[in-house]
Amino acid sequence: MFPMITGFMNYGQQTVRAARYIGQSFMITLSHVNRLPITIQYPYEKVIAAERFRGRIHFEFDKCIACEVCVRVCPIDLPVVDWKLETDIRKKQLLNYSIDFGICIFCGNCVEYCPTNCLSMTEEYELSTYDRHELNYNQIALGRLPMSVIDDYTIRTILNSPQIKNK
């Protein structure tokens, strides 16, 4: 008889605990009732990227000294740096620089450790394409500055977004 009574007591405690959990989750749901949705009509409205957003990498060919620090600090050895040694001036001459954004993890190590600041992160994040070989950017494509979202008159930027206010 005693095991049956303790079983009913445990059942009662479990019922109270379950009701408390349901009540807590219901209160969380009610706290979100007055909030506005954060839906953005993507092609026509865009949220301005944060200040430290890690988008496409911009490369300045004239500043690069072909030191290959970017390759050494990259966790996947991604940047391809081709250079030749100029014997008369005893310096490296950069021939080609490319990054495959299909493989890049956008960690920003190459930008952070570059001694000449020839690499920088842009706000461009629309890199989608149908052919993955188009994601391999050479020094010409990397040197192209992205069109700013703010300057594009066809896109309405979302400045009063709750996501921006929280950051």
UniProtKB/Swiss-Prot annotation:
It is found in: Plastid, Chloroplast thylakoid membrane. The gene is ndhI. This is NAD(P)H-quinone oxidoreductase subunit I, chloroplastic. Its cofactor is [4Fe-4S] cluster. Belongs to the complex I 23 kDa subunit family. It comes from Morus indica (Mulberry). GO terms for molecular function: 4 iron, 4 sulfur cluster binding; iron ion binding; NADH dehydrogenase (ubiquinone) activity; quinone binding. The keyword Transmembrane helix does not apply. [4Fe-4S] cluster 2 binds at residues 74, 104, 107, 110. Residues 55-84, 95-124 form the 4Fe-4S ferredoxin-type domain. One of its GO terms (biological process) is photosynthesis, light reaction. Its main location: plastid. NDH shuttles electrons from NAD(P)H:plastoquinone, via FMN and iron-sulfur (Fe-S) centers, to quinones in the photosynthetic chain and possibly in a chloroplast respiratory chain. The immediate electron acceptor for the enzyme in this species is believed to be plastoquinone. Couples the redox reaction to proton translocation, and thus conserves the redox energy in a proton gradient. It is an enzyme of class 7 (translocase).
